[in-house]
Each structure stands twice: as structure tokens, then as C-alpha cells.
Amino acid sequence: MGSLTKADLAENLVDSIGLSKKDAKDLVEGFFDVVRSSLIERQQVKLSGFGNFEVREKSQRPGRNPKTGEEIPITARTVVTFRPGQKLKSKVEDYMQE
């Protein structure tokens, strides 16, 4: 089992709805450009039936060096998070139980 790539998504659009390869690639790239720019502007991206992407701030917290056991601070940072929607969770769970 491999990974699904942007090229795979574009190829799926070619096969399923008959877009040209160039149009499919442009559509996939355009979609990700919109998601990326929305997150850069700190807008939440809500994809109905799929899930939500959002930018969050993580505050500094204590950590530990696993080799030495020495306590080290983990610096504050900005992260992108994804929360799957209930429909996506249910479909994946149903598939995994088959």
C-alpha cells in the first residue's frame, strides 16, 4: 500500500471525469494553493464531509532529551492541524472493519 500523491489525484480526475491531464494537474494545484493561502492568512479551511484544517499556536513546554534524560524546553511554534469530520471517520472505520 503506497501513498496518494497530487499526481495520483490528477490522474483520478482524468479517469473519472475526463479532464485533460493539464487541466487536472492545474485543478489539483489550484486547490492546494487556495488551501495553503487560506491557512497562511490564518483562515480555517472546512471541507464538508471531510474535515477541517487550521493554524494553531503551541506554547512552549518542557521536554526531555530521550538519550540523556536532560530536560530541555520545546519552543513555542505555529502548526497546521487537521481534524477529520465525522463522515470521514465513519467511512474509514466502516472500511477497516470489513
Swiss-Prot record:
Gene3D superfamilies: IHF-like DNA-binding proteins. SMART domains: BHL (SM00411). Pfam families: Bac_DNA_binding. It comes from Marinomonas sp. (strain MWYL1). InterPro entries: Hist_DNA-bd, Histone-like_DNA-bd_CS, IHF-like_DNA-bd_dom_sf, IHF_alpha. Belongs to the bacterial histone-like protein family. This is Integration host factor subunit alpha. One of its GO terms (biological process) is positive regulation of metabolic process. This protein is one of the two subunits of integration host factor, a specific DNA-binding protein that functions in genetic recombination as well as in transcriptional and translational control. The keyword Transcription regulation applies. NCBIfam families: himA (TIGR00987), PRK00285.1 (NF001401). Heterodimer of an alpha and a beta chain. It comes from the Bacteria.
